């Protein structure tokens, strides 16, 4: 009997389709996360680009100028305070034929692909948390609630002084600190792609709970101060090296993926090329507040 027209068969489920799926799922995860945080679309950068975090100030002159007099110049100063290179990172995952035979492809391949995506997301977020903890707006408060409130207030005050819009404010706090506070309430958290968060909580538009934030600390950053940069794996002439990475469908290629069989070891390798970094434009508009335990 003839196969019904347009039936999807094994011939259409190609390795490249799986590569595209992996790249698309990673991008979709990030788009969901950036939507929660209110961050703009990722910005493409060339490999080797230097990222600069800045401090901005302006010496505003008197605006009461007599008719016909020269208007005095107000001196603006933007000082670079930190540098980071945009670099490509390479990852590889291997699954053996025995693992597929024992657990099936759905577990041995698909589940480990999911775990790989989560780890890649964690690499970017962990580096961002480490950077955010160097923020220069600091104070010590007695309680968790007061720390959150002061963190929000300090970044709003800073952006207002810089005459900049701050949009929504994102707060990052230690997972156990958040749940310790929630223990006496009926509030529950939400989770998206492994990121635990609350919306409109204690004055924060979004509060993200992370074990990468040390206990007893709260970090606040305006969404407009966060930028997600990426290197497009399709930008480089990797084909000249014999490297064929597949990117997702769309204009934002956050990762490149290549799957191949390793016949000499009866295994399958998944290669990932990624260059992503979350960055804050103004380091002096990040609040890092400490508070006493038990708050």
Over which residues does each language-model region extend?
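Cleavable N-terminal export/targeting peptides
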Residues: 1-15
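Sequence/fold signature of self-assembling virion shell proteins
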Residues: 43-50, 192-295
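Alpha-helix boundary/N-cap detector
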Residues: 17, 21-24, 31, 107, ...
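Assembly/oligomerization interface modules of large self-assembling protein complexes
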Residues: 15-89
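Extended, solvent-exposed, turn-rich assembly/linker loops in the middle of proteins
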Residues: 136-206
